Each structure stands twice: as C-alpha cells, then as structure tokens.
Amino acid sequence: MTRWVTAEWNCNWKASVDAFAESYHTAQTHPQLLWYLEDLDLQIDLYEKHSRYLVPFGLLSPRVDSVGEIPPPLKAMLRGAGMDPASYEGSMNDIRVAVQQYKRATQEEQGKDFSELHDEQLTDDYNYLVFPNVTTNTHSDDLMLFRHRPHPDDPNKMFFDVWMFELIPEGEEWPPLPKHDFRPAGSTRSLGMVIDQDASNLATVQEGMNSAGFPGLWLSDQELRLRHFHKTISDYLEE
C-alpha cells in the first residue's frame, strides 16, 4: 500500500458511487484522458449486486482526431511499461498491443509475473463496483480502491477513502506503509488530477438533486450500472 487518504466531500455517498460508474462524463470532466483511452464503446457487466465496465487504455477516444505525434498521455503509458517513446516505430493505433507484448516479453526481467493475466489485463482498466460502496480500478501493476462512506450526521456530505496498492517487483524492498491523511471539506490539497476533476462536479450535482424542481433521474442505457446500483438499493429497502 502506497497511499491512504480520506477526503470529506459535499455530496451524498451515492452520488459519488454514481460518478465512478459511467464513462460518458470523460469528455467534459477529464478531456485529457481522451488522448489515452476508449470512452464510448465499453463492455458493461451486471452481476447479482455488483457491476463492472472494462476501459481500454492505450487508444485514442473516437471523439478526438488522430495527430501526427504521439500525445503525452500515450508517451507516459509507453514509459510506464519501460518503453522509450522516441524509439517506438509503430502506429498510434498499435500502442496498446505493443505495450501488452512488451510487458509480456519483459515480465521476468522486470521482476513481475503476468502469467495469469490475459493481454487486455496488461493495459486496460477493470472498474468494479462491489455493492454497496466500494469501487476498484484494477490494473496489472496497481490497484486503486475507493470507499464511499455516508456522513454520520449530514446526508449532503460523505467521506471518500482512497487506497493505492502497487505491484512491487521481485527483489525490491517494500515501501513503508503510508500514514492516514485526512482532508476536510474545502481542502485545496490535491487527490490527483482525475479524482479532483470528479470531485469538482459533485457538490453542484448534490445541489441540483436537492432542488424543488428536480423530480428524479432518467437513466439511459449508458447508465446501466447506475440503474442496477439504485435498483439493488431499492430491493434491499423494500425487504
């Protein structure tokens, strides 16, 4: 474990769960990720209580036009795999597969064992919702675990817990366990660009849901995971 942070947010915990269970917000909330991942055509799987979607990394979003030079996010992905972007001679469309092949071929010298992972798991994000309030972003080299906790006194607030786990190469020393870091509401300390961007929407979303003019949500097919989540909660409340 390399990180352990709790932030107090001005929204209900279920709004936070929803924010990490659909991908269409990427274009507006995380525009930098359009140069790094596929955000339109995602596999969505629903289970009895849980759900997931699979996000291909190492591809340009169909929302952006291809450019001549490899964009910085894809260069970072190449470097993260141990490759030199300057020496990469393939096309941009082949970066995802090239990273998969390189990580597979060099796993032993990198001190890692990917033998039980298929190729897509070497690059992509496997985003799970473990009902009712745990989200994981699962990758070959790391795991980001989020817990969305109700506030004990105020339904318009919540606690967002972040744990970061990283795969330590064989033979390397494990880093010391991080100390728990608490961020009260209004803190300007960053949780990381992507999480900060998600958090920036949630207080406004909560205000909108509290409006007298808000009758309820109409959820589209893109929001299958949200529909499944709230249906499961309703089923529990009706028991």
Regions found by a protein language model. Give the residues of each.
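C-terminal catalytic domain of Rieske-type non-heme iron oxygenases
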Residues: M1-E239
